[in-house]
């Protein structure tokens, strides 16, 4: 399945153990992740700046993302497609790649619910869709 992970999910996967890390691992192992140079740069800048992750760890992480993602040129998206113009890039990636899911914690994206054929979901919603809920034995450990 083709999946776009928002920078906030990719950052949270490094910043702490938990759901976003599990979502990333699931995508790396079982799905086709979509990325762009701009998305990886955004992750890199925020990890180095706001989060203060040591540069060698950031480099290794970004290299892993590059090696395990299909890079796509985003499709054009109408400027009024979402509230935050910075999110147009992600919608363009989802559109160009034919992504089934765009996984994000960004309310400006989540309020859309879908964009064309892509479902826009939280990390929890994605996890529940691909793993089932904990009562079915597929939840987070």
Predicted regions and their residues:
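Residues that scaffold the ATP/ADP-binding catalytic core of kinase and kinase-like folds
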Residues: 12-14, 46, 112, 129-130
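Active-site neighborhoods of divalent-metal-dependent phosphate/nucleic-acid chemistry enzymes
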Residues: 67-102, 107, 111
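PIN-domain endoribonuclease scaffold, especially VapC-family toxins
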Residues: 26-78
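A secondary-structure boundary/capping signal
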Residues: 6-7, 35-36, 105-106, 122-123
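Short, well-structured N-terminal submotif of metal-dependent ribonuclease cores
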Residues: 1-35
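Acidic, PIN/NYN-like endoribonuclease modules and their adjacent C-terminal/linker elements
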Residues: 81, 88, 107-141
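Short active-site oxyanion
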Residues: 30-33, 98-100, 118
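Amphipathic coiled-coil/heptad-repeat helices and related helical stalk/stem segments
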Residues: 19-20, 58, 86-87
